[in-house]
Regions:
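Short beta-strand/loop segment at the start of cytosolic alpha/beta domains
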Residues: 1-15
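Amphipathic alpha-helical interaction surfaces in cytosolic regulatory modules
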Residues: 19-79
Length: 79
């Protein structure tokens, strides 16, 4: 799994590629926690590079979504 972050105006674009499953999803948690410390107004999550995602990966994304929305931010998923 590869993870990259790009700032685009008031949005932060996150690109995840490879596999997002029970083995790799826990690796995202520290990155997501650091991202939330930045108090982003908008997150764009680009999943176009994913070859595989399982329920653990979906759970990690849903967790991030809930935290961003609770802080008043917008959350978009593309790809």
């Amino acid at each position: 799994m590869m993870f990259s972050k790009t700032v685009e105006g008031d949005a932060i674009r996150i690109e995840i590629s490879g596999q997002l499953d029970s083995m790799t999803a826990p690796e995202l948690r520290p990155s997501f926690e650091a991202l939330l410390q930045e108090n982003p107004k908008r997150i764009v999550l680009d999943l176009s590079g994913l070859r595989l995602i399982d329920s653990s990966g979906v759970g990690a994304i849903v967790s991030l979504f809930k935290q961003v929305r609770a802080a008043g931010g917008a959350f978009d998923v593309v790809g």
